[in-house]
Structure formats: structure tokens, C-alpha cells
Design a protein with these regions (language model features):
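HhH-family (HhH-GPD) DNA N-glycosylase catalytic core used in base-excision repair
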Residues: 1-159
Length: 159
């Protein structure tokens, strides 16, 4: 990928220069491993909410999502019921898509139902693709891989 220099002279992916939010995300999070069950659960949920929307929309609402979904603590989110769904549907700070809200609650419940000794981190690690050369263009980045399809099947199997 062609890197562009920002106002500070640092080279970055072209998309990172589109906004301050993207710039901060690029410099501090993008391409870096995520550790811890709550952090992994947050990323999984936010990626789900992003479907059909731009990532910048989710980044700008991320703090509101964290508040609305109890810091993405799977134990707390799994306990959400109809009253919480109704409240979330009225929260203009998040993406108010009932199917995505219910999927997030369902995913928290599925995470808690994993067999003893299993974790979201371990499940994701089992499906990590082998190391490959860094992509040079956007066309080099596949929309899906054998590993991503396998992970998707396993996640669906767990609920």
C-alpha cells in the first residue's frame, strides 16, 4: 500500500489521514493485537455493529457503545433482557439496530457458555492465519480466508 505523510511527517495508510479519529485509531490500535476477553468481546461486537456501515461511524460512537454495553463485560451483557433492549433502542449514541443489539447479547451468552477452559482468545488464536507477507495494495487483502471461514463456522456452532 502506498503510504502518505501526515502533517507530522509520519508515513501512514492513506485512509488514516481522512480524519483525526482515523488517525488516532491507525496510530494506536490498527494492526495491533487485542488482549483480554472484554477487549476481544468489544472488538467482536463493534465489528458486528459496523456491518453495512463505515468504521468511522463506529469509532465515533465507541464510547457510547462502551457505556451502553457495560464496558463490554460479557457477564453483564449476557444478563440484558427486554428492558435493556428497549433502552438501547432509544439510545441515539449507538447504532440502534435491534438485530445487532440482540446478536450482541446472544454473543455474550454464547461466550459464557463456552466449555470450561475455553476462551474467546483461545478460540480466535486457533484460527489465526499463518504469517504472510504484508499486503502491498488493497487488492492484496482478501475479503475472507480459509481461516476466517473456519472461525465463522465455529462461532456459529457456539451460538
Amino acid at each position: 500500500m502506498t503510504a502518505l505523510a501526515g502533517t507530522d511527517g509520519r508515513l501512514r495508510c492513506p485512509w488514516a489521514l481522512a480524519s483525526d479519529d482515523y488517525l488516532a485509531y491507525h496510530d494506536t490500535e490498527w494492526g495491533r493485537p487485542v488482549h483480554g476477553e472484554s477487549a476481544l468481546f468489544e472488538r467482536l461486537c463493534l465489528e458486528g455493529f459496523q456491518s453495512g456501515l463505515s468504521w468511522i461511524t463506529i469509532l465515533r460512537k465507541r464510547d457510547a457503545f462502551r457505556e451502553a454495553f457495560s464496558g463490554f463485560d460479557p457477564h453483564k451483557v449476557a444478563a440484558f433482557g427486554e428492558a435493556e433492549v428497549e433502552s438501547l433502542m432509544g439510545d441515539a449514541g449507538i447504532v440502534r439496530n435491534e438485530a445487532k443489539i440482540r446478536a450482541t447479547i446472544g454473543n455474550a451468552r454464547a461466550l459464557l457458555a463456552l466449555p470450561d477452559g475455553e476462551s474467546l482468545g483461545a478460540l480466535l488464536e486457533r484460527h489465526r492465519p499463518p504469517g504472510k507477507p504484508a499486503p502491498q495494495t488493497l487488492a492484496d487483502v482478501p475479503a475472507e480466508t480459509t481461516e476466517s471461514r473456519s472461525l465463522s463456522r465455529e462461532l456459529r456452532r457456539h451460538g
